[in-house]
Regions:
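The feature marks non-catalytic terminal segments
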Residues: 216-222
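Short, glycine/acidic-enriched loop or turn micro-motifs at the edges of active sites
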Residues: 49-53, 160, 207
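Short alpha-helix plus adjacent loop in nuclease-associated cores
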Residues: 156-176
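Conserved protein kinase catalytic core
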Residues: 54-56, 163, 210
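Acidic, divalent-metal-coordinating active-site segment for phosphoryl/phosphodiester hydrolysis
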Residues: 203-211
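Long, acidic (Asp/Glu-rich), low-complexity accessory segments flanking structured domains
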Residues: 1-9
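Conserved non-catalytic scaffold segment of RNase H-like nuclease domains
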Residues: 14-17, 21-140, 144-152, 178-199
């Protein structure tokens, strides 16, 4: 889901406070309450995971990449790159996609340590990603037992923002049954953005951040 700013309203303010208090009570460790604090203004974290497959119940994270965004800038000096040691070997198909072999991952972090590092890197900043739902499902499967809750930060889904952008450009008669290509290559090419040939988590996070910034510019940073 994408987040959009709303004008301040007493009921909305009360509901947000109520939700925060409810989540605070569910936290497994009070030291992690920073995830529910106020986010730094005009900052986000773009993230991506590489995994052994697409089954959120059975597959495993092998790398995590994240980068901070501030206003219209990607803070490449503030990025996170983590290799994760999976409990089982990686298949040949998996290696062909993310180029991470078993020996590359042998010195990786245990997944619990990796997601806790990610949690501290994110803080309370809203999240950005391309098909973020999958990445968060993989992360939350590990994090929920440690944190007591799923990642509570607002989400900005790049494919949804792009869909909204393209939908607004369609004439009314085509808005009834729109056909909008949401493939990442198409999205990046249409937005006039460069694509990295490297397929790894941090590069994918940077490209999602580029698309997010461009789409905000096209929307007038509403």
């Amino acid at each position: 889901m994408s987040t959009r700013p709303y004008p301040w309203h007493p009921l909305r303010h009360w509901l947000e406070g109520w939700r925060r208090q409810r989540l605070l009570r569910q936290l497994a460790d009070p030291a992690l309450a920073f995830v529910l604090g106020p986010a730094p203004p005009d900052e986000w974290v773009s993230l991506d995971c590489e995994t052994t497959g697409l089954d959120v119940r059975r597959d495993h994270i092998v790398s995590i990449g994240a980068v901070r965004i501030q206003g219209q800038r990607i803070l490449t000096s503030q990025r996170l790159e983590l290799l994760v040691r999976p409990p089982h070997g990686v298949s040949a198909d998996s290696v062909r996609i993310h180029q991470l072999r078993e020996r590359d991952l042998a010195q990786g972090l245990p997944v619990q340590d990796a997601v806790l590092q990610l949690l501290h890197f994110i803080g309370s900043r809203p999240l950005v990603g391309y098909y973020l739902e999958f990445d968060l499902a993989m992360i939350n499967r590990v994090l929920r037992p440690l944190l007591g809750i799923a990642l509570p930060q607002p989400r900005n889904e790049v494919s949804a923002l792009y869909y909204d952008h393209k939908f607004r450009q369609l004439p009314p008669h085509r808005q009834q049954s729109p056909e909008i290509d949401l493939r990442f290559d198409t999205l990046m090419r249409d937005l006039g953005l460069p694509q990295s040939r490297a397929h790894d988590a941090v590069n994918d996070a940077v490209m999602a951040a580029l698309a997010f910034i461009k789409l905000r510019q096209l929307q007038g940073a509403r």
